[in-house]
Amino acid sequence: MRRLDDRWKVQSECADGTGRRSVYLTFDDGPNPCFTPQILDVLAQNRVPATFFVIGAYAAEHPELIQRMIAEGHEVGNHTMSHPDLSKCGLGEVQREVFEANQAIMLACPQASIRYIRAPYGAWSEEVFTASEIAGLAALHWSIDPRDWSRPGTDAIVDAVLASVRPGAIVLLHDGCPPDESTRSTQASLRNQTVMALSNLIPALDACGYEIRSLPEHH
């Protein structure tokens, strides 16, 4: 199976055609009952939008967080039902992961409009593209990965984004962790660096003349 051989099928930047210095914040692997509310609080305090690529099983466990995301003007995307490496899955399994995640999101919040999918680990394949197209979802990757999941330090996360930012950039951050990793981390400190980094990153991007915006309509 191919992994990003067909890069033209995966959007990793967004040129919105307005000429603005737009940047897009995305969060993977939630919702997490500890850290997602903190991240939503920071976004609300700064009045900026984000897109949350949620794991369907977590959405089913915490529908109130999906509802809060939508109520506060954010977007929810599909990050599969259980976060497998889809490049190792057959088409049937990929379709189940995508469909069940969509279903879980809509059950959690019927007002959600799901436009995008992001493959776990960024592991794209022809099967993922096919399943996404059937589900009416556009494949969305990222252009900046500060590796916040590795807990490199708050300043390191912010500096990594600022060093690579450009108009149309899609920033990858994490508000939770996959099911197979959740038992290996201390919940109390799992994503605290991401929360603190976000509080510093938003004003830093603003100072550099960037505007954090919602993802534009895909074509």
Swiss-Prot record:
Keyword set includes Metal-binding: yes
Domain of life: Bacteria
GO biological process: carbohydrate metabolic process
Site (Raises pKa of active site His): D148
Disulphide bonds in the chain: none
Enzyme class: hydrolase
Catalytic activity, EC: 3.5.1.-
Localization of this protein: Cytoplasm
Active site: D28 (proton acceptor), H174 (proton donor)
Domain NodB homology: 21-213
A molecular function GO annotation: hydrolase activity, acting on carbon-nitrogen (but not peptide) bonds
PROSITE patterns, A to Z: NODB
UniProt cross-references to CDD domains, sorted A to Z: CE4_NodB
Keyword annotations: Cytoplasm, Hydrolase, Metal-binding, Nodulation
Binding site for a divalent metal cation: H79, H83
Assigned GO CC terms: cytoplasm; membrane
Chief localisation class: cytoplasm
Protein family (similarity comment): Belongs to the polysaccharide deacetylase family.
Protein purpose: Is involved in generating a small heat-stable compound (Nod), an acylated oligomer of N-acetylglucosamine, that stimulates mitosis in various plant protoplasts.
Protein name, entry field: Chitooligosaccharide deacetylase
Organism of this sequence: Mesorhizobium japonicum (strain LMG 29417 / CECT 9101 / MAFF 303099) (Mesorhizobium loti (strain MAFF 303099))
